[in-house]
Amino acid sequence: MSNYRVEKYTKENRLAWDTFISGAKNATFLFARDFMEYHSDRFTDYSLLVYKDDLLYAVLPANIVGDKLYSHKGLTYGSLVLSKSAKLLYTFEAFKALLAFLDAKAISSLELRNIPTFYNTMPSDELSYFLFKANATLIKRDALMVIDTSTKIKFQKNRREGINKAKRNGLTIAVEHNFEGFWNEILIPNLQKKHGVAPVHSLEE
């Protein structure tokens, strides 16, 4: 029977982490350590590595707030990241080992934001199934849309009319390298009005 071990990420794991992410079936550049550590001053990292028979089998990008673990509040999404050779039964055991680790560390809850499936390089619905089996609570669901650029999309008539109207009224589109006007007059007021938040990044960033 396989042995599973969970460890908290340290800087000594950086190369192993990034190498694993580059070959995973459900990961993007957001999970690379350079990107994750960009906001290291705002989040307490508590990323986890899961080993199967001493080989890295899965990783969980995560941060901790009190006794609650999130995957990951500094990223658009998080997930249990798996290698391309991952098998359902082994992944189930790895996930159980991860939950047991959190319980042993007195972590009261785990909140996950699954990576959208269109980013996966291979089918990878294991985590959704495990969350169902664990009777997890769904607290939010986002609507996502993707454009398949290999398929021609019909142009709606009202869109064409909008373009023609813009041309008649002298609307022009130009490349602009000064973002200050957009930042202060459009982005900040709209984020505040619609969502009650400020931009995550500063204009300088």
Model-derived regions: residue spans:
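A conserved beta-strand-loop-helix scaffold within acyl/acetyltransferase catalytic domains
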Residues: 3-53, 57-68, 114-142, 146-205
